[in-house]
């Protein structure tokens, strides 16, 4: 119940971030646009996140000679920084994914038993499981909390960066949306959009794939037949990817590039975190 309340609080805060990010103006941020000017015309959110991101894209695009690589480098730096800042939270999240089969067994055990005593026993068993693996359920919420405002800031940054507005990739401007690219038959931009969807799908399915591989190995170890459990969150998982694809089709392709690279970094992070979690579990 505490977790549900925590999610509700986070949802309200994240919505405020979204409204703040979406309410900003989209005037161009060039290399010579000062922080003080942004502070005068915008607000704290723009000064802290949007201006630095836009200027980082401008600088790196100028340095590499390509707005494509400018966005890629900014994305990698952002994601590596987030991984370092939220290392413990990511580790908690990975552990939570690892124990999902055991949690589902407990929930299935008490399925249909809504009396207070049964719910209390289920809660105690789940708490014992968290304690066994040294997991704080709320600790896994920090990483998503930090990532969302960055995404909103990046949305504004790519719409205002002079490098994105005036630069091109293979002769195409990344300021165009995938929807516009489809109408104009700008295929390289559509490739970025499709790659983003595929990378995002792999990213969200990676924890389940890891658990499946581990469960198969465990079954073979004990000479048992592996039965793939039903995934109660399958609709949510695929629904989230569809929702992201729907949103991104109307946002600049530069943001699809950002999300694509972020998903690749997240895939690598998931694998590394799983290795660390497995080593800790063996101790």
Task: Annotate each predicted stretch with a short phrase.
Residues 2-283:
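Helix-loop-helix
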């Amino acid at each position: 119940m505490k977790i549900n309340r925590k999610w509700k609080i986070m949802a309200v805060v994240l919505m405020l971030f979204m409204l703040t990010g979406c309410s900003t103006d989209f005037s161009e941020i060039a290399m010579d646009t000062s922080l003080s000017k942004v502070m005068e015309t915008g607000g704290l959110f723009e000064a802290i996140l949007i201006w630095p991101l836009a200027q980082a894209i401008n600088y790196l695009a100028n340095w590499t000679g390509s707005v494509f690589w400018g966005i890629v480098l900014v994305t990698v730096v952002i994601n590596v920084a987030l991984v370092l800042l939220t290392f413990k939270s990511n580790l908690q999240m990975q552990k939570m994914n690892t124990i999902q089969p055991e949690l589902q067994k407990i929930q299935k055990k008490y399925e249909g038993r809504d009396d207070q005593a049964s719910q209390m026993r289920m809660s105690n068993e789940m708490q014992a499981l968290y304690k066994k693996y040294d997991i704080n359920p709320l600790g896994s919420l920090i990483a998503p909390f930090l990532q969302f405002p960055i995404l909103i800031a990046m949305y504004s940054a790519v719409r205002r960066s002079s490098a994105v507005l005036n630069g091109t990739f293979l002769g195409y401007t990344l300021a165009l949306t995938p929807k516009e690219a489809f109408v104009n038959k700008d295929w390289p931009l559509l490739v970025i959009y499709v790659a983003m969807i595929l990378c995002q799908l792999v990213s969200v399915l990676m924890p389940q794939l890891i658990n499946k591989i581990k469960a198969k190995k465990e079954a073979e170890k004990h000479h048992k037949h592996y039965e793939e459990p039903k995934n109660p969150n399958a609709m949510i998982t695929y629904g989230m990817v569809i929702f992201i694809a729907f949103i991104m089709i109307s946002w600049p392709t530069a943001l699809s590039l950002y999300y694509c690279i972020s998903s690749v970094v997240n895939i690598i992070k998931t694998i590394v975190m799983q290795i660390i979690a497995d080593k800790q579990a063996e101790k």
